[in-house]
């Protein structure tokens, strides 16, 4: 995976695990799906997922507020909801910024 600005998909992650770890394609796919499911399950429960040297995923509550319809200018109530937030680690920020917009090409 290189810093070409492309979007990395599940298939790309599975292929990277297959090539770098040595698992079969089926095992690599199952591994990636298991990790993503575990992260999803934790976030659904409102838990923070902290991955060292990468960052943290967390769920935050947003209260009800008044918004505006941009076309009409009419006030519209926005319901309370939960949003997922990602906060990159200092190490990840440094790697991204020290290698330009393209990132590291390992």
UniProtKB/Swiss-Prot annotation:
Gene3D superfamilies: IHF-like DNA-binding proteins. It comes from the Bacteria. GO terms for molecular function: DNA binding; structural constituent of chromatin. Keywords: DNA recombination, DNA-binding, Transcription, Transcription regulation, Translation regulation. GO terms for biological process: DNA recombination; positive regulation of metabolic process; regulation of DNA-templated transcription; regulation of translation. Pfam families: Bac_DNA_binding. GO terms for cellular component: cytosol. This protein is one of the two subunits of integration host factor, a specific DNA-binding protein that functions in genetic recombination as well as in transcriptional and translational control. Belongs to the bacterial histone-like protein family. Heterodimer of an alpha and a beta chain. NCBIfam families: himA, PRK00285.1. This is Integration host factor subunit alpha. It comes from Nitrobacter winogradskyi (strain ATCC 25391 / DSM 10237 / CIP 104748 / NCIMB 11846 / Nb-255).
């Amino acid at each position: 995976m290189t810093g070409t600005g492309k979007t990395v998909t599940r298939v790309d992650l599975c292929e990277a695990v297959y090539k770098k770890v040595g698992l079969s394609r089926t095992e690599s796919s199952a591994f990636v799906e298991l990790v993503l499911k575990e992260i999803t399950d934790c976030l659904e429960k409102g838990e923070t997922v902290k991955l060292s040297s990468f960052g943290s995923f967390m769920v935050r509550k947003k209260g009800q507020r008044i918004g505006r319809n941009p076309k009409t200018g009419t006030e519209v109530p926005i319901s309370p909801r939960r949003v997922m937030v990602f906060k990159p680690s200092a190490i990840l920020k440094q790697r991204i910024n020290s290698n330009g917009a393209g990132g590291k090409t390992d």
